[in-house]
Amino acid sequence: MNSIENLKEQSKSVFEIRNVAQIGVLGGISFILMTIEFPLWFAPGFYRLDISELPVLIGSFAMGPLAGVLIEMIKVLLYFFIHGSSTAGVGDFANFIFGCSLVVPSSILYQRHKSRKTALIGLGIGTLTMTVASALLNAYLLLPVYSVAFHMPMAALIQMGTAVNPAINGLWAFVLLAVVPFNLFKGILISCLTMLLYKSVSPILHNRIRH
């Protein structure tokens, strides 16, 4: 019951003026990080890695899961309105879902008992949740949308995966050998950075929130 009450209290405090400002700043930082991206050697070139979830995770650890969702939303909306979308917003919506699937489970578990152990468990569960969500959405939504948006048959997209890994010979091989490793790598990287940076950044965030 205490953990539920804590989450309710955090949800109320999120909309205090100082917290709203803090969420806005973290959303802006996340947007900037989202524009800095690079490919990974084991995935096709149109999958590019960024660490924009790092400020989202840090904010959600400090202020709770609702704050994390709002930071993620600000990041995605800024990117959509400034850079536009070649997929009519579908890719941006999926990015929001992926981010929330990492951030929400991680922060909920961390808020239940704030310790290094629960942070690690939460980040592990969040990484797995994001990976599963990404695998399903890529298979049933994103890859078909990319095929239409880029005027490429699905076979051509899969062939881009085959060029990187000859074992990729179909849709689910693409998902299991490219999408899943990509998201596991991303989740582990961002989790490690969060563990390294949160204790240093946390006092600043909490001072701004509480004082």
PLM segments and residue spans:
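Loop-helix junctions at membrane interfaces
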Residues: 1-211
